[in-house]
């Protein structure tokens, strides 16, 4: 035997309660003898009745808005978890920490993107920055990250990974142009590949170069001019990855978006990221998690919590001498290299 429980729709309740309160106020004014009197006591009672009805309406509207805001935040949190999935603390022998902050207070997801994946070709990372921030940038972030997560397993060369990202962005921009003909969007992208021996290769399209931390020394990973951002210009024919040295055991890479160095204080001074990193590692090497916390705290102090742009940080440290990744296929590890690599799923 089935029982069907009737449930009053929330919209009916939302509209019915204010209507009932309004009807009670009008009925009191038209039908109650006390409301027809012109004495001071009658006026006080009438005013009290209408004040109570008005207060009830305001509280009802406020409660509805709070409930709707809570639902929006839950949706935003789910979107953030789907787009910028929490990174495991260890990926193929690398210690990893990342964090991001949206400049739009109404959105938990901004225009910054990052991901780190262990593949048969090495550990591959992406850091990107979509023009604009907040809700409007989510579609582009999803297109670029989705393409990256597939391409890093399929393509043996970083140049072909970058072309996959460029095609995904082009499709996204064509769809956006149909809805918004004046929309001009671009994405800065940094692709990194770290081999088993720590060798670093990179392709940079308009993004800030990361910093390499070696002991207490802080220096840019490379000083060459990057390629133009993805979107406005076609990629060049030759996309040979740039050799950037070796990430030795104990060394760290700090990837970031331009919102970090562009952050200003009340006097208009930019945030000195290299100096902040030098201060963080002056006494002793610290973990990537501590570096992220230290930099975010320094940024909040510098801007007094009023960032004008999205901020993202990603720190990778080579801990391979202290961590052995012998379990093939485990989360955050890569399978042994094969001569005929097949696409794998990112767990």
Task: Name every feature range the model reports, one short phrase each.
Residues 1-77, 81, 88, 113-122, ...:
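Conserved subregion of the PPM/PP2C metallophosphatase catalytic domain
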Residues 79, 83, 147-150:
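Short alpha-helical scaffold segments that flank and stabilize functional sites
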Residues 81-119:
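Acidic, Ser/Thr-rich low-complexity segments on the non-lumenal side of membrane proteins
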Residues 98, 125-128, 192:
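Preference for bulky hydrophobic residues occupying beta-strand positions
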Residues 107, 113-176:
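Primarily the active-site beta-strand->alpha-helix module of PP2C/PPM metal-dependent phosphatases
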């Amino acid at each position: 035997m089935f029982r069907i429980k009737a449930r009053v729709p929330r919209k009916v309740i939302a509209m019915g309660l204010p209507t009932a309160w309004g009807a009670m106020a009008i009925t009191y004014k038209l039908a109650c003898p006390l409301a027809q009197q012109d004495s001071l006591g009658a006026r006080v009672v009438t005013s009290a009745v209408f004040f109570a009805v008005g207060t009830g309406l305001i509280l009802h509207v406020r409660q509805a808005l709070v409930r709707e805001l809570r639902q929006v935040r839950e949706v935003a949190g789910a979107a953030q978890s789907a787009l910028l999935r929490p990174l495991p603390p260890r990926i193929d022998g690398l210690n990893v920490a990342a964090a991001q902050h949206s400049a739009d207070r109404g959105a938990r997801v901004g225009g910054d993107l990052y991901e780190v994946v262990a593949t048969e070709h090495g550990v591959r990372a992406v850091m990107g920055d979509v023009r604009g921030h907040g809700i409007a940038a989510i579609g582009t972030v999803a297109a670029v990250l989705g393409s990256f997560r597939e391409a890093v397993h399929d393509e043996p060369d970083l140049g072909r990974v970058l072309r996959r990202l460029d095609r995904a962005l082009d499709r996204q921009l064509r769809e956006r142009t149909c809805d918004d003909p004046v929309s001009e969007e671009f994405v800065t992208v940094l692709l990194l590949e770290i081999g088993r021996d720590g060798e670093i290769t990179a392709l940079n399209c308009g993004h800030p170069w990361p910093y390499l931390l070696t002991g207490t020394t802080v220096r840019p990973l490379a000083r060459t001019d990057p390629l133009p951002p993805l979107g406005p210009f076609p990629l060049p024919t030759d996309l040979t990855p740039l050799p950037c040295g070796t990430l030795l055991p104990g060394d760290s890479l700090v990837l970031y978006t331009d919102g970090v160095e562009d952050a200003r204080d009340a006097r208009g001074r930019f945030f000195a990221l290299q100096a902040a990193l030098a201060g963080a590692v002056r006494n002793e090497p610290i973990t990537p998690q501590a570096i992220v916390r230290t930099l975010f705290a320094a940024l909040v102090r510098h801007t007094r919590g009023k960032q004008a742009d999205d901020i993202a940080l990603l720190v990778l440290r080579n801990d391979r001498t202290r961590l052995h990744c012998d379990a093939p296929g485990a989360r955050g590890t890569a399978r042994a290299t094969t001569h005929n690599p097949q696409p794998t799923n990112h767990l």
